[in-house]
Amino acid sequence: MFFSFLSIYRKIDKDLFKEMEMIKAVLFDFGGVIAEEGFREGLMAVAKKKNLDEQSFFKTAEDIIYKTGYVIGKAKEKIFWEALSKETGVKDDYRRLRLEILRRFVLRTEMLSLAGKLRDAGMVVAILSDQTNWLDEINSKKPFYDRFDYVFNSYVLGKSKRDSSAFRDVAKIIGIKPHLILFVDDNSHHIKRASEAGLKTIHFTGIEDFKPQLEAVGIKIN
């Protein structure tokens, strides 16, 4: 009888510990996860029209958006476009160029649905994105903020995912320990920094692989 009771106690104790260690929040990247990667695809489309090397043009723009501080709200959008024009020689009206980016941030309905199911299951769901004022513009045209408990935009947060402390800051804001948070991103460098900050991670490669990846970290959704 004693050993039987002890076995039951140990099972309950293990189940309780397992429940305590379950993921309680999921942070999603925006471009490349919740939506198509409009920044990269838009810039590459611009480069193609200008007969420029697409990858090189995108990499230059990516470097500039961080160097100018635009992505963390330290510079206005016009500064970014002026710097890009100076570096690449592209002289078009930036208002036309930005549309090439914005129209390519197409929301992925299946990913929004999955986020909703996680939320219905009691998890905190949030966006953590290196974005700019563009994110609010996208939301104003096709609202999606209401699908999430939090939207962390580097432009507002004042830190990008290139700064590993951003992950710890977000964990404090939502009140959940890093090891109980799952971070989903298509950028391997961001994934590495999030992992080093103590978060569980999924390197997103496509919707087809995402459900099995969730199950691998203990999350099952119908």
Language-model segments: residues:
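Hydrophobic alpha-helical signal peptides and transmembrane signal-/tail-anchor segments
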Residues: 1-8
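Asp-based, Mg2+/Mn2+-dependent phosphohydrolase catalytic module
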Residues: 9, 16, 20-23, 28, ...
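N-terminal helical cap/lid subdomain that shapes the substrate entry/recognition surface
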Residues: 21-113, 120
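Short glycine/serine/threonine/alanine-rich loop segments
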Residues: 52, 90, 123, 176, ...
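Short, flexible loop segments at the rims of nucleotide/cofactor-binding pockets, characterized by
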Residues: 101-106, 129-130, 159-160
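Structured helix-beta-strand junction loops
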Residues: 121-122, 147
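A structural signal for isolated positions on well-ordered beta-strands in alpha/beta enzyme cores
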Residues: 124-126, 182
